[in-house]
Amino acid sequence: MKYQLLKIIVCPVCHSKLSFDLEKKELICNVDNLAFPIRKGIPVLLKRDARNFIL
């Protein structure tokens, strides 16, 4: 994930900033507790494809 993209990309649900989980290759929204997958280098920012998580 390119740093420049991570600076501007936001959660499609609440519009808060996302963090990157390098190990799981996911974009994380800590506000909504959603993890968005990255497939073939492309972030999939669809709520239906996100998984719920609890910290």
UniProtKB/Swiss-Prot annotation:
The GO cellular component terms are: cytosol
Superkingdom classification of source: Bacteria
Residue spans making up a coiled coil are: none
One Pfam family in the UniProt entry: Trm112p
Q: Which HAMAP family match?
A: UPF0434
Q: Which PANTHER family match?
A: PROTEIN PREY, MITOCHONDRIAL, ZGC:162634
Family listed: Belongs to the UPF0434 family.
Task: From the Swiss-Prot or TrEMBL record, give the protein name.
Answer: UPF0434 protein BPEN_388
